[in-house]
Amino acid sequence: MAVTVAQKAQIVQDYQRAAADTGSPEVQVALLTARINDLTGHFKANIKDHHSRRGLLKMVSRRRKLLDYLKRTNLESYKTLIERLGLRK
């Protein structure tokens, strides 16, 4: 099941820096993490869905790039985000 509008709004509200902030790296990483977690469950049932797996790999790569940017620019925010989302590194 895809991430619903209500779930997306809740994620944005939880991770935004200021009111109406939807583009900060923290929000983008949190949204990508929700989509990645959702697709991971999809692949347990649909092992041969290679077309969607390519999209998953692109999302993981985009999340990694955003995390690298955040680590370079704001290390404290990076550390708290990694801990809140339960990601490695």
Swiss-Prot record:
PANTHER family: RIBOSOMAL PROTEIN S15, BACTERIAL AND ORGANELLAR, SMALL RIBOSOMAL SUBUNIT PROTEIN US15M
Pfam families: Ribosomal_S15
GO biological-process terms attached to the record: translation
Keywords: Ribonucleoprotein, Ribosomal protein, RNA-binding, rRNA-binding
MF-aspect GO terms: rRNA binding; structural constituent of ribosome
Family indicated by similarity: Belongs to the universal ribosomal protein uS15 family.
SUPFAM superfamilies documented for this protein: S15/NS1 RNA-binding domain (SSF47060)
Protein name: Small ribosomal subunit protein uS15
Gene: rpsO
Keyword Repeat found: no
Cellular component aspect of the GO annotation: cytosolic small ribosomal subunit
Source organism phylogeny: Bacteria, Pseudomonadati, Pseudomonadota, Betaproteobacteria, Nitrosomonadales
The protein's assembly and partners: Part of the 30S ribosomal subunit. Forms a bridge to the 50S subunit in the 70S ribosome, contacting the 23S rRNA.
Function description: One of the primary rRNA binding proteins, it binds directly to 16S rRNA where it helps nucleate assembly of the platform of the 30S subunit by binding and bridging several RNA helices of the 16S rRNA.
Alphabetical list of CDD domains matching this protein: Ribosomal_S15p_S13e
Record organism: Thiobacillus denitrificans (strain ATCC 25259 / T1)
